[in-house]
Amino acid sequence: DVQMTQSPSYLAASPGESVSISCKASNKSISNNLAWYZZKPGKANKLLISSGSTLQSGTPSRFSGSGSDTDFTLTIRSLEFQDFAVYYCZZYNEPYYTFGAGTMLELKR
């Protein structure tokens, strides 16, 4: 099985800052079969990026995805208040569909 190691598990940042989240696949290349999701309380997970770097309709351009094979990164530039949420990577290199453990992005106090 492919294991997805996501880091960090927790991030604190302020509006206007930029943050990056890493996701690494163990054992084998997953090509670019990697998606990023945003989770907010009481809402369905929102697909932000597929194929490693393809922004979905409605995903703001301040979000970007990069990487291939085993190493991937989600970057959010110029954070806005609505960006504070939990983010997950998911690899979908059949027959596997494996999520990372998530990254909680919180407002820095």
From Swiss-Prot:
Keyword Iron: no
Region annotated Framework-4, chain positions: 99-108
Ranges for region Framework-3: 58-89
Keywords per UniProt: Adaptive immunity, Bence-Jones protein, Immunity, Immunoglobulin
Keyword Oxidoreductase included in the entry's annotation: no
Region (Framework-1): 1-23
Residue numbers spanned by region Framework-2: 36-50
SMART domains: IG, IGv
GO biological process, one term: immune response
InterPro entries: Ig-like_dom, Ig-like_dom_sf, Ig-like_fold, Ig_sub, Ig_V-set, IgV_Light_Chain
Location of region: Complementarity-determining-2: 51-57
Start and end residues of each stretch annotated as Complementarity-determining-3: 90-98
Any Pfam family hit: V-set
Gene Ontology cellular component list: immunoglobulin complex
Sequence segments annotated as region (Complementarity-determining-1): 24-35
Misc. comment: This is a Bence-Jones protein.
Protein's name according to its UniProt entry: Ig kappa chain V region S211
Source organism per UniProt: Rattus norvegicus
